A protein has these predicted regions:
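Intrinsically disordered, glycine/charged-rich C-terminal tails and inter-domain linkers
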Residues: 1-32, 177-240
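Catalytic NTP-binding/metal-coordinating core of nucleotidyl cyclase/transferase enzymes
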Residues: 30-112
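Short glycine-aspartate micro-motif
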Residues: 46, 135-139, 183
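Structural signal for well-ordered, non-membrane alpha-helices
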Residues: 73, 77, 118-121, 125, ...
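Catalytic core of nucleotidyl cyclases, primarily class III adenylyl/guanylyl cyclases
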Residues: 83-109, 127-161
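Acidic, metal/cofactor-coordinating or nucleic-acid-engaging core segments within structured domains
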Residues: 112-115, 122-130, 181
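Catalytic/regulatory signature loops of cyclic-dinucleotide turnover enzymes
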Residues: 141, 164-188
Length: 240
């Protein structure tokens, strides 16, 4: 059959071709990629957002699950536009928000993650909970990631991203102990100053300094690591 011959020829071309890539922090560079063997590599902070209850929602019907997914999609896409990040639909239950190092320091991205958690869990609670229990978690890590095009039109959410940074952010998100938690890697945590790691609370009328983040151990690629998680939120309203 001719289509099998065509597939074989294309597969052979791809397997023999050099996998070229360009190092950049400019997402507009995506327009110059093709669907064959070119990619971009960038150092960036990745915010991985997981809708925790899509598997449960699927039991009530595919349309219901897809409707909920679209609600989260719209909110996160608008947040990414507002904050200047790069938005990507990663899976039927998750999204990536990507912030290049050259334009965003780690503290800025952690602030965005905490504000996102606040907006989704509190600001959008009412419309979301008309449809479902609002249940998500966020994982954040920093490092090199590679993106390659899967379709010739090059839309951002049709770029496939690879990297240990993404895998670690996924693992951190999956270990969230409660809904709405933001988890960050130790690499990200140790880059934050005290204004991001400590806060003041009144306990029994006494003003006390408390930790914003709780440390926990986990295994990643058979190596013991630490992550830090919090349910302290910040608000986008603080920007106004």
């Amino acid at each position: 059959m001719s289509f099998i011959k065509d597939i074989f020829q294309k597969t052979t071309e791809l397997s023999d071709a050099e996998f070229d890539y360009s190092i950049t922090s400019d997402f507009n560079f995506i327009d110059s990629l093709n669907e064959d063997c070119t990619a971009i590599v960038m150092e960036a902070t990745v915010v991985y957002f997981e809708i925790k209850n899509i598997p449960v929602l699927l039991k009530t019907g595919k349309r219901h699950a897809a409707r909920v997914y679209k609600i989260y999609y719209n909110a996160l896409h608008e947040i990414c536009k507002h904050t200047g990040g790069f938005f990507n639909c990663y899976s039927p239950t998750s999204f990536l928000m990507i912030y290049p190092k050259e334009k965003f320091d780690l503290a800025t991205v952690v602030n965005i993650a905490m504000k996102t958690a606040d907006l989704i869990s509190i600001g959008l609670r009412e419309p979301i909970e008309k449809l479902c229990h609002n249940n998500f978690s966020i994982g954040v890590d920093h490092g090199n990631i590679l993106g390659t095009k899967t379709l010739c039109n090059g839309k951002s959410n049709q770029i496939v991203w690879f990297g240990r940074t993404i895998e670690k952010a996924i693992t951190i998100s999956s270990l969230s102990q409660r809904p709405f938690f933001v988890g960050i890697s130790s690499k990200v945590f140790h880059d934050l100053d005290e204004s991001m790691t400590k806060t003041t609370k009144h306990i029994l009328g006494i003003k006390k300094e408390v930790d914003v983040w709780t440390r926990m151990s986990y295994q990643f690629e058979n190596v013991k690591k630490h992550l830090y998680q919090t349910n302290f939120h910040k608000s986008f309203d603080e920007e106004e």
